[in-house]
Design a protein with these regions (language model features):
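S-adenosyl-L-methionine-dependent methyltransferase catalytic core, i.e., the SAM/SAH-binding region
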Residues: 1-44, 53, 64-315
Length: 315
């Protein structure tokens, strides 16, 4: 099961979809956003055609790709869309610029990124994303290559492991956690992690929060999630047409900080540039500045509680 998209209507509305536009969904997953984009394109086409009833077309318009959907997990292709306007891209969104160049796309009208991890990954024990199961400690989004979370624990130094826990899990006790895991080597499963930390049976809320942060840190490091996000944002900025929009859903403070600063400044450093007269120079006009889901939506979809929507329009 893939997660129910948070703020779906608000996100799609934020893209301001044009019927003849070209769009990118860099986090295809279950395909919820991609299907909504294609539906909105079709609605726009029907609206245009109904308004030009007297125009006689000499030939049928050629169908072209209008939506490119990325996912580095090949299992997502099981949710493929039967639509000639749609193209699946099996790859990490950090390579957005490379893939668009390959497809001959030089500019786009919009891009959406839902940075949440799918229920699909948490609920499949063998993926190793959740401490609810005693399973191989994998955590790779793309299982066709790369290092696993077990590889990190078994090969990183104590300082390196502590850095990961402190930076990506924001854990104040990162050092002792790293030490206990290293002392328990070799670590192969999620259960090994719990046993190394002296956790068994029912987990109390404090330890559960600690484990959640620790597993988040390992997942971010294994997949270089923040590095990939930074590269994707730069590529999106360069590909967007004037008037084109980028919509990003974030779920934790680390990724939200990166997106917020980038949309405000247009650069990864978050430095606001000004002209000679002191006017702010930025490639984006902010449309949504961290919108949260409504109480009604959170009641239906508790996962939406931590979601924040940010939308920027290229100027």
């Amino acid at each position: 099961m893939y997660h129910i998209p948070a703020m779906l209507e608000e996100t799609i509305a934020g893209l301001n979809i044009k019927p003849d536009g070209v769009y990118v969904d860099v986090t295809f997953g279950g395909g919820g956003h991609s299907r909504a984009i294609l539906d909105r394109i079709a609605e726009g086409v029907r609206s245009q055609e109904s308004g030009i009833r007297t125009k006689i077309r000499s030939q049928k318009s050629e169908v072209r790709t209008q939506l490119y959907s990325f996912d580095q997990d090949i299992e997502a292709y099981g949710n493929a869309i039967d639509d000639a306007r749609w193209q699946f891209v099996h790859g990490n969104f950090r390579y957005l610029a490379n893939f668009m160049d390959y497809f001959g796309v030089t500019e786009i009208d919009g891009l959406i990124a839902d940075l949440g991890v799918s229920f699909h990954h948490f609920d499949e024990a063998e993926r190793g994303f959740s401490f609810r199961f005693d399973a191989p400690l994998d955590m790779r989004m793309n299982r066709q290559g790369g290092r696993t979370a077990a590889d990190l624990i078994n090969n990183y130094s104590e300082d390196e492991l502590a850095r990961v826990f402190a930076l990506y899990g924001e854990l104040k006790n990162a050092k002792p956690l790293a030490r206990r895991l290293i002392q328990a080597r070799p670590v192969a499963t999620t259960g090994d992690v719990l046993r190394a930390l002296g956790i068994s049976g029912e987990i109390d809320p404090r330890r559960k929060k600690e484990l959640t942060c620790l597993f988040q840190a390992l997942r971010i490091e294994v997949n270089d999630e923040l590095g990939a996000l930074r590269e994707m944002l730069v590529a999106a900025r360069d590909l967007l047409k004037p008037g084109g929009r980028i919509a990003v859903l974030t779920y934790h403070s680390l990724e939200d900080r990166i997106v917020k600063n980038f949309l405000r400044s247009g650069n990864l450093e978050g430095e606001i540039q000004k002209d000679f007269y002191g006017n702010i120079l930025t490639p984006f006009r902010l449309i949504e500045k961290g919108r949260s889901a409504s109480e009604e939506e959170v009641a239906r979809n508790p996962r939406a509680r931590s979601a924040k929507l940010r939308v920027g329009e290229k100027v």
